[in-house]
Design a protein with these regions (language model features):
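Bacterial Sec-exported substrate-binding components of ABC uptake systems
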Residues: 6-7, 12, 23-70, 173-205, ...
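Bacterial Sec-type N-terminal signal peptides, specifically the leucine/valine-rich hydrophobic h-region
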Residues: 18-21
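Short helix-initiation/N-cap motifs at beta->coil->alpha
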Residues: 47-49, 104-115, 238-247
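A short, structured surface patch at a secondary-structure boundary
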Residues: 63-120, 124-131, 234
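Extracytoplasmic ligand-binding site segments that recognize negatively charged/polar headgroups
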Residues: 92, 132-136, 151-165, 199-221, ...
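Proline-aspartate-enriched helix->loop->beta-strand connector
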Residues: 107, 114-127, 146, 246-263
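Structured C-terminal subdomain patch of bacterial secreted/periplasmic proteins
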Residues: 160-161, 165-168, 174-181, 188, ...
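Alpha-helical, coiled-coil/dimerization segments enriched in small aliphatic residues
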Residues: 214-243
Length: 322
């Protein structure tokens, strides 16, 4: 009986060792699955009506739009970016982002193309929504294995939700919340400084269309930024985010201030010179009084510069309040 017990015990021991070894062999996938579950994957987002589902954290990101690139840098996610696009017309990254920004490879200078994004090996695209045209669609990109999150915010609440979503996707939710809190504090301070002031009538000068001026309409985040800074966008009732208006309409509206979007080319100084030389716009009292507020183009986009934009606008509208 003793010998039989020893044999049974030996067999049980061998079985336990084999099970342990088998467990070790499967430990990496188990750990991966556990990590994925802890991160909350799979995740589904309502991205402005587009249902985005992610089974795992993206590894290779393309950003289209300087605002999208800067937002990733602000959240410490620059190492995820394998290429960026749409630096045409952009001025420059903020000083605190410049080193990281300059280290990111440029996929395309202008709009990204379907071929360029797919051939890059990217698995995720964060792009300002006006790049989606022709065959460069969310459907075509996702059919080629590239998940897409569209940067389409038209309000401050919406851009903050985008920041929260990006934070959740890449496991940096605490950073996202801290960044939003910092932005909110700065906006609150700027709004407090101009509280009680009579709103100034504002016209946004983006670019000359040849037969008018391209400006910000109602569903444009800049309309809310202007309001936060103590202004009133004279063309907020127009139903498009960006729309051309005639010189006669601008003259009739009689703005108190003109906000000039500063591109790489033409720069703000060239636009101001053109306004002063124009036989219609030069009639405006604000032009004669040189009431111009220069806003970097990137500040007008939904991204990491919400507070920067409100501060710049508020100081331009009410310089004596600061």
């Amino acid at each position: 009986m003793n010998r039989s017990k020893k044999i049974v015990a030996l067999l049980l021991t061998l079985m336990m060792v084999m099970m342990a070894l088998a467990g070790c062999g499967n430990s990496a996938p188990a750990d991966d699955n556990a990590a994925a579950n802890e991160a909350g994957y799979p995740m589904t987002f309502d991205n402005y009506g587009h249902e985005l589902t992610l089974d795992k954290m993206p590894e290779k990101v393309i950003t289209a739009g300087p605002n999208c690139t800067e937002l990733f840098i602000a959240l410490g996610l620059q190492d995820k970016i394998i290429g960026n696009s749409c630096d045409n017309h952009a001025q420059a990254p903020l000083d605190e982002y410049k080193e990281a920004y300059d280290a990111i490879p440029e996929l395309t200078f202008g709009y990204p193309t379907l071929e360029a994004v797919v051939s890059s090996g990217a698995d995720f695209l964060y792009a300002i929504d006006w790049v989606f045209e022709g065959d460069f669609t969310i459907e075509n990109l996702e059919a080629n294995g590239v998940k897409v999150y569209s940067n389409s915010a038209s309000t401050v609440d919406e851009i903050f939700q985008e920041i929260r979503d990006i934070g959740k996707i890449f496991g940096v939710e605490d950073r996202a919340e801290a960044f939003i809190a910092s932005q909110e504090d700065r906006i609150d301070d700027a709004m407090a400084a101009v509280e009680g002031m009579d709103p100034v009538k504002v016209f946004c000068y983006d670019c000359d269309t040849g037969d008018g001026i391209y400006t910000a309409g109602g569903p444009n985040i800049e309309t809310e930024l202007i309001e936060m800074a103590g202004g009133d966008n004279l063309f907020k009732n127009l139903e498009k985010a960006w729309i051309g208006v005639s010189l006669e309409n601008i003259l009739e509206a009689q703005p108190d201030v003109i906000v000039i979007h500063d591109y790489d080319e033409p720069v703000a100084a060239d636009k101001i010179a053109a306004i002063k030389a124009d036989p219609i716009l030069s009639q405006l009292q604000c032009v004669q009084d040189e009431r111009f507020v220069i806003l970097p183009l990137e500040d007008a986009f939904p991204g990491s510069r919400t507070a920067d934009a409100v501060e710049t606008l508020a100081k331009g509208f009410f310089p004596d309040a600061f």
